[in-house]
């Protein structure tokens, strides 16, 4: 018996809505990354983008457990000497909760062209409203 290898033309993509209100950032991000990658499908193929589209709503209401809100830092470097910028997650979640969520998911996806292609299927919204009603997304209940 041969192994099944999915082709890009054979893949059927669904749309899912995930409500992140009151849920831990990392747990939601790991499940979203798994769906974007396509690991929830029996036809998963590692070298093909076979994942589904995901809409995340209420990103501003996501929580971090413990003292991570003040102790965990978002770091970026300008590549100049002394160019390290560190921002606590409390500030990041107040100003740009969409960015914090996208970064968490991006770091869980593969690096390279395939990971960037998967990340394009992620739509994160601050509030409960989204403009993808025409795609008829299904509500996805998270395992946690």
Swiss-Prot record:
Parts forming coiled coils: none
The keyword Ribosomal protein appears for this protein: yes
UniProt GO MF annotations: mRNA binding; structural constituent of ribosome
Keyword hit for Ribosomal protein: yes
Cellular compartments per GO CC: cytosolic large ribosomal subunit
InterPro entries: Ribosomal_uL13, Ribosomal_uL13_bac-type, Ribosomal_uL13_CS, Ribosomal_uL13_sf
Subunit record text: Part of the 50S ribosomal subunit.
UniProt name for this protein: Large ribosomal subunit protein uL13
Annotated gene: rplM
């Amino acid at each position: 018996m041969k192994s099944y290898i999915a082709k890009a033309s054979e893949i059927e993509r669904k749309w899912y809505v995930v409500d992140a209100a009151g849920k831990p950032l990392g747990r939601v991000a790991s499940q979203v990354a798994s769906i974007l990658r396509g690991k929830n499908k029996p036809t998963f193929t590692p070298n093909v983008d076979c994942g589904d589209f995901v809409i995340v709503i209420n990103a501003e209401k996501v929580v971090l457990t413990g003292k991570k809100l003040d102790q965990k830092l978002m770091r970026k470097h300008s590549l100049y000497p002394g160019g390290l910028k560190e921002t606590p997650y409390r500030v990041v979640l107040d100003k740009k909760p969409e960015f914090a969520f996208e970064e968490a998911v991006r770091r869980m996806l593969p690096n390279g062209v395939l990971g960037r292609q998967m990340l394009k299927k992620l739509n994160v919204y601050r509030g409960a409203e989204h403009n993808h009603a025409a795609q008829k997304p299904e509500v996805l209940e998270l395992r946690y």
